[in-house]
Amino acid sequence: LPLFANKSVDYSFTSPPYNRKRNDKYRDFTDINENWLQLNIDVLNQLLRVTKKHIFYNIQANYYNRQDVYKLIGLFSKSIVDIHIWEKSNPMPASGKNITNAVEYFLVLGNESLKSNTTYTKNIITTSVNSNMPKEHKAVMKTDVAEHFISKFTNENDIILDCFFGYGTTGVVSKKLNRLFIGI
């Protein structure tokens, strides 16, 4: 990101690692544990520098990172123009009497209020979780979720940056909707 020119992309749409800090069946995924908050601060500062319009930053507040997520929201409160909720209709159930985490946040950052391409756009999207997830990565975002944001808040030929490109969901949806994309 430091190599990108100021205001060189129209939008950013990305989902950083969760920072699970667990030694379970997903232990081989290299989430950033030690400096997770600082990583997100650095990334958001760079995205604010390179993005002309809005940043859609998908983040999940779980048991391990909840305090850091709320700190992040506080630190960027002047740049956050909206917060959208992705409600999962079939989330992974919690064990015992623990509360099932059924939502993820989309922090929307920018210098101006967010306007939709459609009328009556809600700040909540409800979908099932991705049942066709590859074995190597069990948390791939559904294309429906990316399509919701990209179709409603960007226009054809806009350049969309995803700095945590992963399996390329942003690219697939951008191409389908005639947007340009950069994935790193």
Regions found by a protein language model. Give the residues of each.
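Core catalytic lobe of class I
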Residues: 1-184
